[in-house]
Amino acid sequence: MESYKPVWLKGAVILAINLIDKGYKPVAVGLGERDFYIDVKSDTSITLDEVKKAINENVLANVPIENNQIVYKGNKVSIIEDKVSISTNLNPKYFEILNISTHHPNPNEQYVRIRGVAFETEEQLKDYLTWLEKAEETDHRLIGEKLDLFSFHEEAGSGLVLFHPKGQTIRNELIAFMREINDSMGYQEVYTSHVFKTDIWKISGHYTLYRDKLIVFNMEGDEYGVKPMNCPAHILIYKSKPRTYRDLPIRFSEFGHVYRWEKKGELYGLLRVRGFVQDDGHIFLREDQLREEIKMLISKTVEVWHKFGFKDDDIKPYLSTRPDESIGSDELWEKATNALISALQESGLKFGIKEKEGAFYGPKIDFEIRDSLGRWWQLSTIQVDFNLPERFKLEYIDKDGIKKRPVMVHRAIYGSIDRFVAILLEHFKGKLPTWLSSVQVRVLPITDEVNEYAEKVLNDMRKRRIRAEIDYAGETLSKRIKNAYDQGVPYILIVGKKEASEGTVTVRARGNIEVRNVKFEKFLELLITEIAQRDVEQTTVKALK
């Protein structure tokens, strides 16, 4: 999606100017995950046909932009986008309006929101619309509703997700896996508050450079902020007692809740929310330990993505360099950048460069992952930071008794766990691997006469911590099988009189695979192994065939 966004933004600007020429009053343009949007004052009605007519109008050669606003014929239209710039080289001619709806930025205002896409060639537009049709079939928002995983409620607030029991099960499994990865690297897990005085954000630089996303309030004369990052809190834990060179590296991990005030037009299901959980980690270490630490992080990151079935061709690291707005000296930035380059080169990974896309406090390695629909998602990040240790005056005692500054590394492998859930749901089309599935087995007794045996099968699985359910014979067997498939259940066990008398089950798996006369204990043993190994494929049914 990222590669399309510059031409979409240019298309939105062009359409906004043409709408002004038609007498309408657009107030803002911006980008969503899959399209552009234009908000228009709703004091006059606007139809799809009228928008389409505006598309075909002549376009100004040079778009008048001042202070991130379109300034045209006395109108000022805000450009709600800070990552994509408007290119004079792009010339979108082929538009598709996807949706026109009512948008309420607050209770007292109402706009008409136009969503669409724009491309330079007709072929690009056709290809995208074909892809979009496939993508809509696997939209995580629809899957989440269908599988009863999560929900959003306006009365709770935009961009604030409520995970239901089945959705929380998926999150718990992801967290348990990452805990094992963290343990293998020597991390110590911590917990920090959701709210801090803004003093620490002022020291860190977030207060100035991240101010538009900070949620700030005053209580009893002090100013507080809901945390957008976990790093300052981990720094305070490091500072809580003296450290020596023998203590380093010190690795803290946290499944930390963070909150960022994203603009309402940018919110999109779990992919863009205002509150989420990061699999966050911070390492404090000596300069001489940096390269090996980065190499280990790169190796573990690739290992994690392989576990989810992503191949080497689906994993692409990028080095992101110093942005225009940053803190720290040229010398520190050069040191940090060179450390990342060395680790990438020694890891043997081919990597790209993203100029000026580093964090404000240091350069970083970002990993992009390609899903089953061919989309690239930025997920993992590894960031070297010489600046925050300086700002917070972090120290350790060297072997010579001299106080020195540690280096700090920020890292997250999933990134946002909530966002990663969305990506997995779309990547697997709702059919998650068995270990991640909220319901792993559903037992279907053919008649009520075998309910006792079916319940024994169910309870034996639950004793072994397998997430199993039973669907009694209230509907036809074929209907219950279809329900289980539609709800993403990996394994269905069908039991009738024959199975009850022989201690067997009929196993059905995805892909309409059926294996009869399977000893229940054998199935159970294989399933436990599949789950314990976190296999992506259904290895149990493969072993039974």
Swiss-Prot record:
One of its GO terms (molecular function) is metal ion binding. The gene is thrS-cat. Its cofactor is Zn(2+). HAMAP family: Thr_tRNA_synth (MF_00184). InterPro entries: aa-tRNA-synt_IIb, aa-tRNA-synth_II, aa-tRNA-synth_II/BPL/LPL, Anticodon-bd, Anticodon-bd_dom_sf, Thr-tRNA-ligase_IIa, Thr/Ala-tRNA-synth_IIc_edit, ThrRS_anticodon. Pfam families: HGTP_anticodon, tRNA-synt_2b. Its EC number is 6.1.1.3. It catalyses: tRNA(Thr) + L-threonine + ATP = L-threonyl-tRNA(Thr) + AMP + diphosphate + H(+). Keywords: Aminoacyl-tRNA synthetase, ATP-binding, Cytoplasm, Ligase, Metal-binding, Nucleotide-binding, Protein biosynthesis, RNA-binding, tRNA-binding, Zinc. Gene3D superfamilies: Anticodon-binding domain, Bira Bifunctional Protein, Domain 2. Zn(2+) binds at residues 231, 282, 410. Catalyzes the attachment of threonine to tRNA(Thr) in a two-step reaction: L-threonine is first activated by ATP to form Thr-AMP and then transferred to the acceptor end of tRNA(Thr). Also activates L-serine and transfers it to tRNA(Thr) but cannot deacylate incorrectly charged amino acid; unlike most archaea the editing function is found in a freestanding protein. SUPFAM superfamilies: Class II aaRS ABD-related, Class II aaRS and biotin synthetases, ThrRS/AlaRS common domain. It comes from Saccharolobus islandicus (strain M.16.27). Belongs to the class-II aminoacyl-tRNA synthetase family. Transmembrane segments: none annotated. This is Threonine--tRNA ligase catalytic subunit. It is an enzyme of class 6 (ligase). Residues 139-433 are annotated as: Catalytic. Binds 1 zinc ion per subunit. One of its GO terms (biological process) is threonyl-tRNA aminoacylation. It is found in: Cytoplasm. It comes from the Archaea. Homodimer. Probably interacts with its editing subunit. NCBIfam families: thrS (TIGR00418). One of its GO terms (cellular component) is cytoplasm.
